[in-house]
Amino acid sequence: MSPIFINITLAFTISLLGMLVYRSHLMASLLCLEGMMMSLFITIALMASNTHSPLINIMPITLLVFAACETAVGLALLVSISNTYGLDYIHNLNLLQC
């Protein structure tokens, strides 16, 4: 296994651990999720460049589109929760009430 893949795997693991540790703060969770998406993007882009298959070349772009949609929805939720409750600490929020 090359050092690049080891570093990308380490970045994904650190982002995953950060997601587990900071799951009660929405902003920190979104940042960790973006770190996971970027490490997945780099991994898929490297695999696409190594295989030279025309079908796999669209996968990194598709992942970036999904990451952008996830970011937009996450930031919209963050703004909505921050405007309503004044904080991003989602552990104390009861989001099921009307």
Swiss-Prot record:
Listed GO biological process terms: ATP synthesis coupled electron transport
Enzyme class (EC, first level): translocase
GO molecular function, one term: NADH dehydrogenase (ubiquinone) activity
Superkingdom in the source lineage: Eukaryota
Family: Belongs to the complex I subunit 4L family.
Keywords, sorted A to Z: Electron transport, Membrane, Mitochondrion, Mitochondrion inner membrane, NAD, Respiratory chain, Translocase, Transmembrane, Transmembrane helix, Transport, Ubiquinone
Species name: Chlorocebus aethiops
GO cellular component entries: mitochondrial inner membrane; respiratory chain complex I
Protein topology in the membrane: Multi-pass membrane protein
Pfam families, alphabetized: Oxidored_q2
Catalysed conversion reaction: a ubiquinone + NADH + 5 H(+)(in) = a ubiquinol + NAD(+) + 4 H(+)(out)
Entry function: Core subunit of the mitochondrial membrane respiratory chain NADH dehydrogenase (Complex I) which catalyzes electron transfer from NADH through the respiratory chain, using ubiquinone as an electron acceptor. Part of the enzyme membrane arm which is embedded in the lipid bilayer and involved in proton translocation.
Main localization category: mitochondrion
InterPro entries for this protein: NADH_UbQ_OxRdtase_chain4L/K, NUOK/Mnh_C1-like
UniProt subcellular location: Mitochondrion inner membrane
Transmembrane region(s): 1-21, 26-46, 61-81
Protein name: NADH-ubiquinone oxidoreductase chain 4L
Subunit structure: Core subunit of respiratory chain NADH dehydrogenase (Complex I) which is composed of 45 different subunits.
Entry's EC annotation: 7.1.1.2
